[in-house]
Amino acid sequence: MLFTISFDNLATEATADAFETMLAARAADTAGYRFRLRSIAVGCAEDSPVDLPLAVQVRIVDDVSDGGAGTATNALTPEPHDSLGRASVITGGSKYTAEPTTYGDPLFALEMNLRASLIKEWAPEDAPVVNRDQLLGLLVAPRTSAARTISGCMVIEEF
C-alpha cells in the first residue's frame, strides 16, 4: 500500500554544504516489517525562486534502537493513497533539531537548482528498501550560504 509523507515551507540551513534532514520515515520495530521508497520530490516554496544550487541525498540509519536517530521538530503521519485503506505503521518527522548521527552512505544523491524541481521515481524492483527499525532520511544542503524555503515529499510502499 502506498503512503505519502510531505513537508511544506521549511527553511534550509544558511551554511554552505551543511546537510540537514528535512524529512524522514521510520520503519516499525516489528519482525518482517519493511517499506520501499517509491519516489521523492523537492522544490522551491518561494514566490520568486533564485538561482541557488542545492544538494539532495537519501540516506538510511541502519538501526534506530542503537541511538543516533535524531529529534524531529514535527511529527508527521503518512497519508494513504487509498482513502479507504488502513493507517500506516510508519512514523515520520521533519525539520530535525538534533540530526541523526549514524547515516550510512547515500542511496541517492543529486545536485539541483531551485529554479527547477526534482522528482525521482523508482520502479518496485529498483526501489531502496528500508528494513525493520531503520530510518530513511531526505537530506538537503544549500551550496551557498543562503537559507531557502523548500517543500517536498516521499512516497513509500509498505509490504
Predicted feature descriptions by range:
Residues 1-159:
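Beta-strand-centric surfaces of beta-sandwich/beta-rich domains
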